[in-house]
Amino acid sequence: MKFSTLEHILIHLSFSICSIVITIRLINLVVTTILKPYDFSEKGIITTFLCLTGFLVTRWIYSGHFPLSNLYESLIFLSWSFSLIHIVAYLKKNKNLSRITASSTIFTQGFATSGLLTEINKSGILVPALQSEWLIMHVSMMILSYAALLCGSLLSAALLVITCRKKFNELLRLIESLSFDKIQYRNQRIHLFGKTYFFSVKNYYKIQLVQQLDYWSYRVISLGFIFLTMGILSGAVWANEAWGSYWSWDPKETWAFITWIIFAIYLHTRTNKNFWGANSAIVAVIGFLIIWICYFGVNLLGIGLHSYGSFKGMAS
């Protein structure tokens, strides 16, 4: 069997499994069945992880270099990183994080296997600037950081949605209470004590969910920030060897630095308990947008020292 055929089978098998997992989860939101979609989805993502690992190893052997030389390969590695985080979340029994990583895996892999990247989905000879032992260290750290930071930011976004929805519902109840006359108010008081337990339990679970989202978003973003720092530092050393300068302020480097600053601000807000929750989550959501600009948006420009990373070279 040719390497290209094996790659084709592995990548489309993993995409098909992800699609089935997402479909079952969507159906489960509407219809309750006797199946256990959570257990099935975990096994599906683990199988996807193994398929993607097989794809990366196969391409590594076939091409002779680590498969991070173009946008297509970096997207596959990003999808692999999401599935890796998903497995960690599964072992930690964190369903909230695993839901996000499963969706992220199917999104990135779906884009990678779409017709938009057909021209670069085949491995080629590395350009001279990429023929370095720093390729694995720098690009892998950057992609892992993107995966972790994106997952953490999505957890923060979920926290914001729940918090804003709660405040919106409280505002609606306040408006409704102001429109009631005295008779309606007395009738409400009769039923108030019967409903107190229901609302207290409901609010308790919401508070628990918000706290878990806040806790895990902080943990995952902290890990991503470490990877990002290592990626930037290793990239600076590599740049000095390749171009004779540690930093050149080209678009890719500039936006990577902006990304680092945004998440440094996020971590700084975590030092003050008054900024925990929604306040720090807002910074993380901003960081989510910045990451996509840094990773994908800058590549579309095709300018700067990382111009070969647009659609023909590295996409770190």
UniProtKB/Swiss-Prot annotation:
Entries under InterPro entries matching the protein: Cyt_c_assembly, Cyt_c_biogenesis_CcsA, Cyt_c_biogenesis_CcsA/CcmC
Any one GO cellular component localisation term in the record: plasma membrane
GO biological process: one example: cytochrome complex assembly
Single GO MF descriptor: heme binding
Function noted in UniProt: Required during biogenesis of c-type cytochromes (cytochrome c6 and cytochrome f) at the step of heme attachment.
NCBIfam families found in the cross-reference section: cytochr_II_ccsB
Family stated for the protein in its record: Belongs to the CcmF/CycK/Ccl1/NrfE/CcsA family.
This protein's name: Cytochrome c biogenesis protein CcsA
Organism name: Trachelium caeruleum (Blue throatwort)
Name of the gene encoding the protein in the UniProt record: ccsA
